[in-house]
Amino acid sequence: TYLKHNIYFIQWAKENHQIKSLDEGKKYVNEWLEMREKQGLSAYTVKLETSALMKLYSISSNEIYKSNARYRANIQRSRGEKVRDKHFSEEKHKDLVRFCRATGLRRAELQQLRGTDLIEINGEPFICVSKGAKGGRHRNIPLAFEKDFIQGLMSSKGDNKVFEKIPNGADIHSYRAEYATRLYKALARDINTLPKSEKYHCRKDLKGACYDKKAMLEVSRALGH
């Protein structure tokens, strides 16, 4: 669980503050937690993300952002919805949410995506990401998930944009993080069978956690890093 929430933070810090290393992200932790609270996340989720980042960066309770319980109570609506739900409904935008969780595209990439960006390479479908890509880095994303859904949706759009508008309330960063975690799990080999050179060993508080380097690299490429 901590890994998932830390991935959310790292993806956000890379895209908004252009961090180049994990350590560079530490100074943005409190900004992230304050933003997450204002987005209307539950007290439980904010606390969970706080604990995850405190562990990741060895941050003391004196340094970490203190959640504003009164503010959080005020933003909860009587029927249990969050304030951000006024502006965005996953149910009403289920195709967008499903697409994001299956492709990991950035907001700017989604805004520029057209039906004709669905291509074939050696008989296999890919999404060609060229417009809106960060740093102008072109990449082709294989359809690892929801292949029929994505092909059907994009093919139906022709030269038109796949999504006319990306709502501001859509939490694209979290969908990217979900995609990253999902793709890593799909690609990762049995860690016990890998030679030392193909393993990534975490340090400090995450010491003991070990990941498949090859799978991590493929996920990074798919995300456009």
Question: What is each of the regions a protein language model found here?
Answer:
Residues 1-72:
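N-terminal core-binding DNA-recognition domain of tyrosine recombinases/integrases
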Residues 41, 63-90, 134-145, 158:
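DNA breakage-rejoining catalytic core of tyrosine-based enzymes
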Residues 45, 49, 92-93, 172, ...:
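Hydrophobic (often cysteine-bearing) scaffold residues that line and stabilize catalytic clefts
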Residues 77-107, 210-216:
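Basic, Lys/Arg- and aromatic-enriched nucleic-acid-binding interface segment
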Residues 79, 112-149:
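Conserved tyrosine-mediated DNA breakage-rejoining catalytic core shared by Y-recombinases
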Residues 108-113, 219:
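Alpha-helix N-cap/helix-start motif at helix boundaries, enriched for small hydrophobics
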Residues 133-179:
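C-terminal catalytic core of Y-nucleophile DNA break-rejoin enzymes
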Residues 166-216, 225:
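Short basic/aromatic active-site micro-motif
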